[in-house]
Amino acid sequence: MTTDYSSPAYLQKVDKYWRAANYLSVGQLYLKDNPLLQRPLKASDVKVHPIGHWGTIAGQNFIYAHLNRVINKYGLKMFYVEGPGHGGQVMVSNSYLDGTYTDIYPEITQDVEGMQKLFKQFSFPGGVASHAAPETPGSIHEGGELGYSISHGVGAILDNPDEIAAVVVGDGESETGPLATSWQSTKFINPINDGAVLPILNLNGFKISNPTIFGRTSDAKIKEYFESMNWEPIFVEGDDPEKVHPALAKAMDEAVEKIKAIQKHARENNDATLPVWPMIVFRAPKGWTGPKSWDGDKIEGSFRAHQIPIPVDQNDMEHADALVDWLESYQPKELFNEDGSLKDDIKEIIPTGDSRMAANPITNGGVDPKALNLPNFRDYAVDTSKEGANVKQDMIVWSDYLRDVIKKNPDNFRLFGPDETMSNRLYGVFETTNRQWMEDIHPDSDQYEAPAGRVLDAQLSEHQAEGWLEGYVLTGRHGLFASYEAFLRVVDSMLTQHFKWLRKANELDWRKKYPSLNIIAASTVFQQDHNGYTHQDPGALTHLAEKKPEYIREYLPADANTLLAVGDVIFRSQEKINYVVTSKHPRQQWFSIEEAKQLVDNGLGIIDWASTDQGSEPDIVFAAAGTEPTLETLAAIQLLHDSFPEMKIRFVNVVDILKLRSPEKDPRGLSDAEFDHYFTKDKPVVFAFHGYEDLVRDIFFDRHNHNLYVHGYRENGDITTPFDVRVMNQMDRFDLAKSAIAAQPAMENTGAAFVQSMDNMLAKHNAYIRDAGTDLPEVNDWQWKGLK
């Protein structure tokens, strides 16, 4: 028997489904018992503090009901991304109605008892969040911090050609910078290889206490706006369900058929021409179906519908009748049986199995997640038989490795960035792939642009790159986001939100593991002499170090071989944010590939060829974390050894900075005994660090040895010479060597002439660069001589 999905009878069932979702959503706000109002409502049935939001709910439930309809009609693989921040009930209510919630949480049964538990737990101690948190079936996007819904949807459908991301965008959310720029995503979705995004702008007109911009914009101007970005908006407007149901059904059919037509043409004709994708603009009142007014003020269709629209709680039942009237307006007896189960005629129109948006495998670890097939990183090793003699650019070396990662993983590995792949010297990847770019290509002026490619860096937006990568890894694939170190601060709150997702998801047995999020910080603070002070900020190291240690790794490889070893680790890891600070400029190469592997595996190591303590207790410990810190420390050690060959020096190179933390703070941390093995209990430690110094001081605070002299970035910068950036922050060889003398009281007299010579070199440096515009030959031409 053929089903007429647009018939009044079918749409009447859709309406019942919608009312059921609305009923559940209101119940979750207010009730902790008596979920179907089968007896008179009393104070103990109501929460002491109803917490949550109402304004966006009915509109989203309406959209969700109609998405279910097109899933059934067209046999779609579709999932839901809830952009509007405060609408946690939407995905909970709908996943409860379709049974997914009970599949995952069997105690939340499809009856009165289960409904009572569902209501009580919402925004309740020990319960669930008021957003689409990881606890919510079908969610890959919490929506607490606004602006990333489309980016996440796009990241998810890349290389998933059969999937459609139904992304509901709040009209308030659409005013954020990240969301505004994400409308440009049309230029990067390949209709042959990728799936599709169906944005639905939920235009209810109001934010917390202000109107929205789109809410006061005419349809004509909205149409022009979206058409300029290759979207074809389909408008649906109204507040009468009898009229809006057929209107949205027609709009959804039109949108899905256009998506299918675009993909069919592209795939049958191998034609990846930039299409015009459909989207829906859905105008319905904020707080739709809720109280019309309260105490003389308008509620429905007003900002006042945003949160809890009527004042009823366990301690104030004066207006309980209004709450009951609201709930009963959905006619729950038409929707639920006496035992609390859903009526059969409503069940008939709900998708089943993996067709349910809440059960789509893409939302729980991906459709077909696979580990990466990695090349042997040792095959790309740089010769370091004479330490420091070989000069290479670490990112160029690594790009050859990444080129072959792409070759071995042609459909589940991507590079993302804000137009910085070339600037960050990842040249090698373009030997095997291109940038994915759907706009016109001008061969005489463009480079590596093509409709299909494994690099997505042609939009200058850190938010887009980060959001795309998050959507990609949350759906089981792998990748990295490479950007300038200072401008990764643009997305540090996104990194925080991703960390929070990882943490909460990891606490759920049913959530599958995610590949790690890999962030590559290049063009770093001590290499930004040419762009200056604005481009100098290593603070993401400190920002991420403040998060739960189980989910954060920070690597500071000093050379190409160490970067290769780090890459092998991060691409095999899961459930982490891997933050890698690396060099793109020509730098001396220090560690053999096996030394590098050991440094990465252990997190740090004593470098015998740069130490003179011969296993005995040293006079001074030098430590370095980062490219320039390692270079300057080795140069300082050479200076000291040449002048004081009897000084017993130990050099510790640190790659995994957070490994130094106490096990009381980080389960991977070194024990006190291990820490003392490297740094002693009381000998002076001169620590050259790539970032802000307090991170190192915090690490040493819990240790025996407080005899610490940290030289990091001291917030001094300018457009100057490369070495001068280090001098400005006293993270140069001369200041490090001076610090080592000052740290040893016994050398106050014997080291005085040496300290003066260091001051003389600093004065010479300052004079020379202001005359020549380049660094001293003694710096530019410096070579490691060795200590033995």
Swiss-Prot record:
- Enzyme Commission number: 4.1.2.-
Is the keyword Lyase in the record? yes
User: Per its record, what are the GO molecular function terms?
Assistant: aldehyde-lyase activity
- Please name the top-level EC class of this enzyme: lyase
Recorded hits in PROSITE patterns, A to Z, give: PHOSPHOKETOLASE_1 (PS60002), PHOSPHOKETOLASE_2 (PS60003)
Per UniProt, which keywords does this protein have?
Lyase, Thiamine pyrophosphate
So which cofactors does this thing need? thiamine diphosphate
Gene Ontology biological process: carbohydrate metabolic process
User: Which Gene3D superfamilies does this entry report, sorted A to Z?
Assistant: 3.40.50.920, 3.40.50.970
Sorted alphabetically, which InterPro entries does this protein's record hold?
A: Phosphoketolase, THDP-binding, Transketo_C/PFOR_II, Xul5P/Fru6P_PKetolase, Xul5P/Fru6P_PKetolase_C, Xul5P/Fru6P_PKetolase_CS, Xul5P/Fru6P_PKetolase_N, Xul5P/Fru6P_PKetolase_ThDP_BS
Question: What family is it from?
Answer: Belongs to the XFP family.
NCBIfam families from the UniProt entry? PRK05261.1-3, PRK05261.1-4
Full protein name: Probable phosphoketolase 1
Taxon lineage? Bacteria, Bacillati, Bacillota, Bacilli, Lactobacillales
